């Protein structure tokens, strides 16, 4: 059940003028600490959209992101989908309240990239997290 005091989004959602995401279920939406956050019980996606201010190629940005990846990362995936290069990896984080699973995903487009960290309590939500990352779509390129 989503929180009644926050906006609810589902399906295709235009995050910025350049990037959209498709959410497979109803999620609440908020802005927190400069991030766009989508959440529902058991799964939370923290999202930041970056511009390509330095005019770097997708490959240059991918290499930079790869060098900044945690040494604890596993299950890394790379692929190109149309004009978007995708990179993701998993982390398992141990916190005071227990184990939290995470999928960190990047969609690298012509004019920028999206960074998304999706945290989920139940390993069964991994496919939902992957579907959200795969749905990131650059909608307006110059």
Label every model-predicted segment.
Residues 41-43, 50-54, 92-96, 109-111, ...:
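Short, flexible beta-strand-to-coil junctions
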Residues 10-68:
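Secretory pathway targeting signatures of secreted, lumenal, and periplasmic proteins
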Residues 64-112, 119:
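Signature of long, low-cysteine stretches enriched in small and polar/charged residues
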Residues 1-11:
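Short acidic N-proximal helix/loop "leader" segments that mark the beginning
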Residues 25-27, 114-142:
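Surface-exposed amphipathic alpha-helical segments
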Residues 30, 57, 98, 125-127:
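Intrinsically disordered, low-complexity acidic/polar segments
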Residues 8, 23, 101-104:
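A generic local structural motif
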């Amino acid at each position: 059940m989503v929180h009644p005091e926050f906006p609810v989004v589902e399906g295709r959602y235009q995050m910025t003028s350049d990037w959209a995401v498709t959410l497979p279920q109803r999620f609440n939406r908020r802005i927190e600490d400069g991030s766009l956050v989508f959440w529902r019980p058991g799964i939370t996606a923290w999202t930041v959209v970056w511009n390509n201010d330095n005019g770097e190629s997708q490959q240059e940005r991918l290499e930079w992101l790869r060098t900044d990846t945690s040494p604890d990362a596993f299950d890394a995936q790379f692929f190109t989908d149309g004009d978007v290069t995708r990179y993701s990896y998993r982390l398992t984080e141990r916190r005071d309240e227990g184990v939290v699973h995470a999928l960190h995903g990047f969609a690298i487009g012509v004019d920028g990239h999206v960074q998304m960290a999706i945290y989920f309590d139940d390993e069964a939500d991994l496919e939902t997290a992957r579907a959200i990352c795969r749905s990131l779509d650059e909608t307006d390129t110059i």
